[in-house]
Regions:
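N-terminal periplasmic "start-of-domain" segments of outer-membrane beta-barrel proteins
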Residues: 36-74, 103, 111, 146-147
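Hydrophobic, lipid-facing positions within transmembrane beta-strands of outer-membrane proteins
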Residues: 38, 102, 162-164, 177, ...
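Extracytoplasmic beta-strand/coil segments of soluble accessory domains associated
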Residues: 43, 48, 54, 80-122, ...
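A beta-strand signature from Gram-negative outer-membrane beta-barrel systems
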Residues: 136-180
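Short strand-turn segments of transmembrane beta-barrel domains in outer membranes
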Residues: 164-201, 211-225
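Transmembrane beta-strands of outer-membrane beta-barrel pores
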Residues: 183-189, 199, 215-219, 241-243, ...
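Acidic/polar loop-and-plug regions of large Gram-negative outer-membrane beta-barrel proteins
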Residues: 220, 238-240, 245-330, 355-408, ...
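Face-selective signature of the C-terminal outer-membrane beta-barrel domain
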Residues: 325-355, 386-519
Length: 519
């Protein structure tokens, strides 16, 4: 039985990790993990206070970080910031705490050209292939992360990766019962709690599981008006089959972000201007000016019988929410069919709902130009409600600022299946099939702002309708991204293991179906 409780503080951290170990080369899918042979040696050593990582001696350019290094970083930090330790990897974090997003590049390729997976399932957005680091899995349950520099595994289910592959592997449940709690606190109101429970082995067949949860909040580092709020749950059940390494594991993940953006300032230095993110502001010139404060605001009440103009309250980027709900269920499995034949099957399902916020000046009245009678609709980038009192002042003459996010809801299913055949002790082949199907529903409903300028309904689920009950939205489309891929791989050892040869071929077949319901 294990109990562990840790309290740590965090503002900004320079972490130095050292590890001397030999680990298996965990790749993307269970089949890729099973196919790779031998040990990759990863060494970390301290040199002038900077952690060093050596390239593994393999046929592919790879770098690996394990929990020994990951656990030395800031608690709750996104794994994309942790792999910043690797040569060739560059990650620019939006804040010091890991929940505010960032930008990843590897050897010059941006995140739309980098494939990132967790336990074999792809994390790139199926629309534009972007990565969102604020939605990454908690680092405490990551066993290791390996980065293929400039290569992908042949069964990689991606239509975009031409740069590198970042493969995240979560740990398996421990054999013994255990409980762990970690707490962190720091500047900008940062506070995070993480807890996990391992059941230990539950029965004679070896079933075991773990469950974890975390909550992290902090104030936005610029502007002083927004907040970062992240909640995450993870679970994994592992069932060994026999004593030859066969198994089935089922893992689940849910992540909820309710974050505000923090905007950038104009690249102007006019001394007559005030520091801030508005177009009339300027860039900070001193360290003290970096921590500018955005003033609170109130939307004025409408006046009956007057054509009220839209308030500017809530228009700044810093008032925007960047909400997201993401989850997945993933299965990994290995089945030995004979002494030479092994089957791996990894199915998964994912869900995402997110938007980038934004507001628009809505018209309570109808659109009149070039028509016989006023009409409603989203026209010229503006919603015309044609007779709806949005601000409650008893008339329909006003222009009112409302929330107008661009929502994307995605359901994604996938499977990676591979069959490995061991020709002899020195040669093996593998054939694989990968399927990935993403359903994207993209809409642009509107909803009201609260009196302080922030959105009252971050996804606009209670969407505003015109006088005839029609939902007004700036976009309304449905698309499917469908990938079928077949691949094959050969690996062989020659000259008493002095030469290792790896050959692979992949043939992806990708199509996208789009239905646009907007006129």
């Amino acid at each position: 039985m294990k109990f562990q409780s840790i309290l740590s503080t965090a503002t900004s951290t320079l972490a130095v990790g050292a590890a001397f170990l030999a680990v298996p080369a965990f790749a993307q899918s269970t089949g890729a993990v099973d196919f790779e042979e031998g040990a990759i040696v990863v060494t970390g050593q301290t040199q002038n206070g900077v952690a060093g990582v050596k390239l593994p001696n393999t046929s592919k350019a790879k770098q690996v970080l394990t929990q020994e290094i990951i656990q030395t970083q800031v608690p709750g930090q996104t794994i994309n910031d942790v792999i910043n330790l690797m040569p060739g990897v560059s990650f620019q974090n939006n804040d010091a705490f890991g929940s505010g997003g960032g930008t990843l590049t590897i050897r010059g390729f941006d995140d739309s050209r980098i494939s990132q997976t967790v336990d074999g399932i792809p994390l790139n957005d199926t629309g534009g292939y972007a990565l969102y680091s604020n939605q990454q899995i908690d680092p405490e349950i990551i066993e290791q992360v390996n980065v293929n520099l400039g290569t992908t595994d042949v069964d990689s289910p991606t239509a975009a990766a031409s740069g590198s592959t970042v493969n995240i592997r979560t740990r398996n449940p421990f054999d013994d019962f255990g409980v762990r709690f970690l707490g962190s606190a720091g500047d900008f109101g940062f506070f995070r709690m993480f807890g996990e429970i391992d059941t230990g082995v539950l029965n004679s067949s070896g079933t075991k599981a773990f469950f974890s949860a975390s909550k992290a909040v902090n104030n936005t580092v610029y502007g002083g008006i927004g907040e970062i709020d992240k909640t995450q749950f993870n679970a994994k059940i592992y069932q060994p089959i026999g004593d030859n390494g066969d198994f089935i594991s089922v893992a689940g993940h849910w992540n909820r972000n309710r974050n505000n953006f923090f905007g950038s300032t104009p690249l102007r230095t006019d001394p007559t201007r005030v520091v801030g993110p508005d177009s009339s502001n300027r860039f900070p010139l001193t360290k003290k000016e970096r921590f500018y404060k955005i003033a609170d605001c109130q939307i004025p009440a409408g006046v009956t019988g007057v054509a009220d103009p839209a308030s500017s309250c809530g228009s700044l980027y810093d008032f925007r929410y960047n909400p997201s709900d993401t989850g997945n269920i993933r299965i990994n499995s290995r089945f030995t069919l004979s002494d030479k034949l092994t089957l791996n099957v990894d199915p998964s399902i994912q869900y995402t709902k997110a938007n980038g916020g934004g507001t628009v000046d809505a018209r309570e009245f109808g659109y009149e130009r070039g028509v016989a009678a006023p009409i409603s609709g989203y026209i010229g980038g503006k919603p015309y409600f044609n007779g709806v009192d949005l601000n409650g002042d008893g008339d329909t003459q006003d222009t009112v600022r409302i929330l107008a996010p661009s929502n994307t809801e995605t359901w994604r299913i996938g499977v990676i299946a591979s069959l490995r055949y061991d020709i002899n002790d020195f040669n093996r082949v593998r054939v694989a099939y990968s399927y990935d199907r993403g359903r994207h529903r993209q809409t642009g409903e509107t909803s009201l702002l609260k009196s302080n300028g922030f959105g009252s309904d971050v996804f606009s689920d209670n969407a505003l309708a015109d006088a005839d009950g029609n939902i007004l939205q700036k976009r309304d489309r449905l698309s499917y991204a469908i990938l079928h891929q077949v691949s094959g791989e050969y690996t062989g050892d020659f000259m008493n293991d002095r030469v290792h040869l790896n050959l692979g071929v992949r043939a992806p077949f990708f199509k996208r179906n789009l239905t646009n319901n907007c006129l």
